[in-house]
Amino acid sequence: AKTVGVISEDPQRGLVKWAKPVGVVGAVCPSTNPAATPVNKAMMSLKGGNAVIIAPSPAGAATTRRTVELMREELKKSGHPEDLVQLLPSPVSKEMTQEMMNQVDLAVVTGSQNNVQRAMQSGTVTIGVGAGNAPVIIDSTADLDDAAEKICASKIFDNSTSCSSENAIVILDDVYEDAIAALERAGGWRCSEEEREQVRNTLWQGGKLNRHVIAKPAPVFAEIMGLAKDAASRKFFMVEEPSVGGKHTFADEKLSLALTVYRARDFNEAKAIVRAILDVTGKGHSTGIHTKNMDHARELAAETDVVRVLVNQAHTFGNGGGFNNSLPFTLSMAGGTWAGNTLCDNLNYKCFINLTHLVTTIPEDKPSEEELFGPYWERYGK
C-alpha cells in the first residue's frame, strides 16, 4: 500500500488523501523480543517516511544493538541515510528513555505497563499496547489433535516469551482427559501435584516472576523446576489448577513454557474462567477457541472484553496477522480502552502516518426529515 504522497482519490466523493510522516518516532522495545520488535517498528516507521529512535530494554540491549547495526547497513547499501534508524547509546537508563519520549513526535511503547504510563505522561502522542496472557478454550467439538499441535507450536515459539503465547487452556469436562492425552502426544508434560507446587514456588519469588527461569528452553526449565527426568525431553509443561487465582499465580502471565490447564463443567463456565483470567492480566488483548461450533466462537467474542478472538489457530502466529487470517501483520497488539490503550487494533503502518484530506464540493445529497426521523416517528409518533 502506498504511504507517501497521494494515496487515494475519489472524484465521486470529492476527496483526495495525502499521507505525510509523523516525524521522529521513539520506539520502546521489550527485553522479551529484542530483535524482531525493533525491526517491525522500524519497518512501519520507514514506510511512512519517518525516522525512528529505538530504546532497548537494558536486558536485551546487546541483541537490539546488533539488530540496529544490521538495519543501518541495509539502509546504507540501498542508498538511504543510515540515521533514519538510530539507537539510544549504552548504557540505557529509564531517564534517557524518558527524555527520548519527551522529545520525539510519536512514542510507540511495547513493554511493561509502567513504560506505557510513563510515555503517556510525557506529553508526547503515545501508542501503547496491552499485556498479553492469552487463555484458550478447547470445547467438546474440537479436533483435539489439531488443537494440541497448534497449541504446542505456538507455546514453544521463542520459549513462550510472546505476548500472544497461550498462557492457559480451558478444557471442557467431557473431553478433558482426551485433550490432555492429545497435548501429551504433541509434546506436553503433565506435571504431578508435587511438580506443580515446585513450579509455582520457583516461578514466582518475592512477589514477581523469577527472571532467572523465564524464557528458558525446555530441558533447562525442567531441570530448574526439579521435574522428573523424563520431563527434560518434552516441549512444554502442563500445570493443572482447580480455580483461578490472582496476581503471581498460575492465572498470571508466565513468560515460560509452563501452561496452566483449567477444567470447565460446560461452555458457560469455560467463558467465565477466561474472563477471570483476563481480569488478572491481559484484559483487552486476546483469547481463542478450538471448536467446530461457530456459535461458541461468536458467544466468546460477544461476551469477552478483548480485541481479538482467534478460532482454531496457533495463537502466537495468528494474533500478529497470519498468512491465513485478515489481521494486519504486527508484533505489537493493542488492547483498546480495556487495556488503557488508545488503539483497538494491531499496530500497523497506518499508525505511523498523518493524513491530509483535500475536500471539494459534490452534488448535494441532503436527506429529508422523513428519511431522518421516519422510523422514530413511526414507532413513537411526532
Predicted regions and their residues:
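Hydrophobic alpha-helical scaffolding
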Residues: S90, D105-L106, I137, T141, ...
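ALDH superfamily catalytic-core signature
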Residues: V39-N40, M44-G48, R66, V116-G245
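Conserved C-terminal structural/oligomerization subdomain of aldehyde/semialdehyde dehydrogenase
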Residues: L227-K382
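Electropositive phosphate-/nucleotide-binding environments in soluble metabolic enzymes
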Residues: A61, R65, K94, Q113, ...
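Short, surface-exposed amphipathic charged segments that create phosphate/polyanion-binding patches used
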Residues: M100-Q103, D143, L203-R211, F250, ...
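Rossmann-like NAD(P) dinucleotide-binding subdomain of oxidoreductase/dehydrogenase enzymes
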Residues: V4-D146
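Structural motif
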Residues: G23-A27, M43-M44, N50-I53, D83-Q86, ...
